[in-house]
A protein has these predicted regions:
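Bacterial Sec-dependent N-terminal signal peptides
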Residues: 1-22
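Aromatic-residue-lined binding/catalytic grooves and analogous aromatic/hydrophobic interfacial grooves
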Residues: 21-452
Length: 452
């Protein structure tokens, strides 16, 4: 009897696990995204993109997790700040809070720097017909983003992914009618920049053109991180015309677009200009590397790399159903309105969190910030910094318990940088010569001083 019960339980558990495993982990919608919160984030741990999926203007915003304002902290700032602490204590003991408040300004340093957006790609469609049958999804199981729609009787399908092994944001546009892809590509940025175009062929199946965008973070260019991004386009059929800062595609059946980037960030204690990384050469190397692979090969390499981490963890909850009738947005609304629960959403929520951390935390010394790695804003909320009193820790709660411990390595490296700068903060601001400290805000440069 007991053996029968065990076998039955094993059968039920196996069935539940197989059922949960077969449920696709997808966010899906039937309209394009209009603003940041409705975009679909993809990332390779350093380079990321926000995909909005517009049918007339498909906007894609690029980010690099190492692209911040500023330069390394001056460790000798406010060397005598700790001398004000006895006066502050005295004012507090005397209940002279106004005086204490004014004195504490002497033990505040500069605020953290800003995490900034990199560049924005606009793909303007020449087909002005109304789009119908729109669908877009973010497939968490394979880290692929896709949208599809019909315009003028033509079915268009677009796919996007961010590859860690090949350091690229990749996109493919397909039409089910020959020569139906006609669009204009433009690359711009909110930070100081210049764009130039180049063309390697005038026509044919191997048409190829590129846009190169070079710029720097907001501020003095001699004290700022610089970047170089290269966008390349190759078509199947049709013609490509590169002009000024745009690429015009006419009469293609398929178009593949790649974006690579490099910055001059070379470490928290290295000046981004005088000691910066050779970002122009690195971007060029990243771009040339792609000629070794077809789009499908890059896609396969990306999926294999991602799933080697993602597939380690499975969450099985009862009564989970993948809803093909209600969009993810509608399901969430119904869930919060208590119109019937679906444990699928809870499973999706957990796996989406894992997806985001895998997508934004694979750069040594640079952990996920308040934005993860995705921001459309020139001045990110709360500077997009590292709020170490809770938010930074929250980002990494799932790293080990959800079986992806290597995602925490950038955080470990960052803590070592905080310790290096923090011993000067402990000495200068608190008169402590043994040990180190960090205040509640930090940035790419491992700032540790207190601020107001």
């Amino acid at each position: 009897m007991s053996r029968t019960i065990v076998l039955l339980l094993f059968s039920v558990i196996t069935s539940l696990s197989a059922s949960a495993k077969n449920l696709p982990m997808k966010l899906w919608y039937d309209t394009p995204g209009e603003y940041f919160e409705e975009s679909m984030p993809i990332g390779n741990g350093r380079l990321g993109a926000l995909v909005y999926g517009g049918t007339q203007d498909n906007m894609i915003q690029f980010n690099d997790i190492t692209f911040w304002t500023g330069k390394p902290v001056n460790r000798n700032d406010d060397e005598g700040a700790h001398k004000w602490i006895p006066e502050i204590r005295k004012a507090l003991f005397n209940e002279d809070y106004k005086l204490a408040d004014s004195l504490q300004l002497h033990v505040q340093g500069n605020n953290s720097q800003f995490y900034q957006p990199l560049a924005t790609l606009h793909i303007l469609d020449d087909n002005t017909n109304e789009a119908t049958g729109y669908y877009r999804e973010l497939d968490i199981d394979s880290a692929l983003c896709k949208d599809t729609y019909i315009k003028g009787g033509v079915r268009y399908t677009r796919e996007y992914f961010a590859s860690h092994p090949d350091k690229v944001i990749a996109m493919r546009i397909r039409a089910d009618r020959k020569g139906a892809i006609n669009c204009l590509l433009s690359l711009t940025s909110l930070v100081p920049h210049k764009v130039r175009s180049s063309q390697t062929s005038a026509s044919g199946d191997n048409n190829r053109a590129s846009l190169t965008i070079n710029g720097h973070a907001t501020g003095d260019p001699m004290n700022s991180i610089h970047f170089s991004g290269i966008l390349t386009t190759q078509t199947d059929g049709g013609k490509i015309l590169a002009s000024d800062s745009t690429i015009l595609i006419n009469g293609a059946t398929e178009a593949v677009i790649y974006f690579v980037n490099a910055t001059s960030f070379n470490g928290f204690d290295k000046h981004p200009v005088t000691e910066g990384a050779p970002y122009i050469e690195q971007a060029a190397d990243n771009s040339w590397h792609l000629v070794n692979y077809s789009y499908d090969q890059l896609r396969e390499r990306h999926i294999a790399d991602y799933k080697a981490i993602y597939d380690r963890f499975q969450l099985t909850l009862g009564n989970a159903n993948f809803d093909t009738k209600r969009t993810t947005a509608q399901q969430l609304k119904d869930y919060t309105d208590n119109k019937g629960g679906n444990s699928y959403l809870e499973t999706l929520y957990a796996q989406y969190g894992r997806y985001l951390l895998i997508s934004c935390s694979r750069t040594p010394g640079v952990p996920a910030n308040l934005q993860g790695l995705w921001t459309p804003h020139l001045w990110s909320p709360w500077r997009g910094n590292y709020t170490v009193n809770i938010n930074l820790e929250e980002n990494y709660w799932p790293a080990e318990v959800a079986n992806m411990p290597e995602m925490a390595m950038p955080l470990d490296n960052f803590i070592a940088a905080l310790a290096a700068n923090g011993k000067f903060t402990a000495k200068n601001y608190y008169g402590i010569t043994q040990g180190w400290c960090s205040s509640h805000n930090s940035d790419l440069w491992a700032m540790t001083n207190p601020v107001g």
